[in-house]
Amino acid sequence: MIFSTLEHILTHISFSIVSILVTIHLITFLVDEIRKLYDSFEKGMILAFFCITGLLVIRWIYSGHFPLSNLYESLMFLSWSLSLIHRVPYFKKNQKFLSTIIGPSAIFTQAFATSGLLTEIHESTILVPALQSEWLIMHVSMMILGYAALLCGSLLSVALLVIAVRKNKKSFFTSNPLFKLNGSFFFGEIEYMDERINVLQNTPNTSFFSTFFSTKNYYRSQFIQQLDYWSYRVISLGFLFLTIGILSGAVWANEAWGSYWSWDPKETWAFITWIVFAIFLHIRTNVKWKGTNSAIVASIGFLIIWICYFGVNLLGIGLHSYGSFTLTSN
C-alpha cells in the first residue's frame, strides 16, 4: 500500500514537471531571447529524471520483477533512458544546445506514458512463466537503451538535414514563416546570425559585411560538424546496445520457446532496424558519405525505430504482442 501510494505521488509529480517543461519549451519556441528559461528547463529535466528513477525502483520492489512488463513501464524506462542520454552532451563545453534538441524526446515520451491513455495498464501484474527469467533485465533493458540512443542520434541527424537544407535553399526557408519559426526553436543562435547579416546587407561597407557573412558560414559549418560528430557517436552506442539486446533475446527465446529466431513482426523489424544502422555506420567510414548523406540514412532509421518499438507492438500479434496489453498469467 505504501509503495503504491509513493508510486502514485511520483507519477503525478513527474507528470506535473513534464507539463511545466512543455510550457517552458513552448515559450522558448516562441520567444528565443528568454535565455534563463533554458536553465529552468535543464533543472526540471534533472528533477523529472530522479522522479522517474524513484518510480521505477519502487515499482521494481513491490512487483518483484524489473518494471518492463508492459507498454507503460517500457515507455517510462525509455523516457528515463532518453533523459540520461540527453545529459551527456550537456556537460561538454559549448554543447548545451545539443541537449535542447534531444530533451523534447524525453519530455513527450514521459507525457504520453503518464497521460490518461495508458491508465488501465499502470498497475503492475505477475509475469507469464516464460518471462519470469533473469534474461528480462538483460534483453529488454538493452533493447530500450539501444532505442533511446538511436533515437537521440537520429534526431541529431534530422537536425543536421534541416540545417543543410536551410543552407542550400535559404531563399525558400527565409520566405516561409513556418520554417523560420522552427529554426528559432532549435537553432536560435544561427537565426540570430542571419538577422545580423540581413541588417549588414543594407550598409555600404561591403568588406565589413563580408566579414560577418563568413562568420555566419563558419558558425553554421561548426554546428553541422558538431551534429555529425555527436550523431555518429550516439548512434554507435545505440547500435552496440541494440546488438547486445538482439543476441541476448535470441538466447532467451531459445530457452523459453525452443527457437533462437521466429521471424515474428517484432523480431523482423528489430532486424531491419539493425540493418539500417549497420548501413549508416558502414557508409560513415567513407569521408565522402559523411554529413548529409549518412544523415539521410539515420533519419530513415528514426522512423523505423518508432515502427519497431511502438507500431509493431500495437498490432497484437506474434510472441512480442505486449503493446497495450498487460502480461498477466492465467
UniProtKB/Swiss-Prot annotation:
Superkingdom of origin: Eukaryota
Transmembrane intervals: 9-29, 44-64, 65-85, 97-117, 143-163, 234-254, 263-283, 295-315
UniProt xrefs under InterPro entries: Cyt_c_assembly (IPR002541), Cyt_c_biogenesis_CcsA (IPR017562), Cyt_c_biogenesis_CcsA/CcmC (IPR045062)
Topology relative to the membrane: Multi-pass membrane protein
BP terms from Gene Ontology: cytochrome complex assembly
Keywords associated with the record: Chloroplast, Cytochrome c-type biogenesis, Membrane, Plastid, Thylakoid, Transmembrane, Transmembrane helix
Subcellular location(s) per record: Plastid, Chloroplast thylakoid membrane
Any GO molecular function: heme binding
Cellular component, GO annotation: chloroplast thylakoid membrane; plasma membrane
Entry-linked PANTHER family: CYTOCHROME B_B6 PROTEIN-RELATED, HEME EXPORTER PROTEIN C
Family recorded in the similarity comment: Belongs to the CcmF/CycK/Ccl1/NrfE/CcsA family.
NCBIfam families cross-referenced by the UniProt entry: cytochr_II_ccsB
Purpose: Required during biogenesis of c-type cytochromes (cytochrome c6 and cytochrome f) at the step of heme attachment.
Subunit structure, interactors included: May interact with Ccs1.
Protein name: Cytochrome c biogenesis protein CcsA
Gene: ccsA
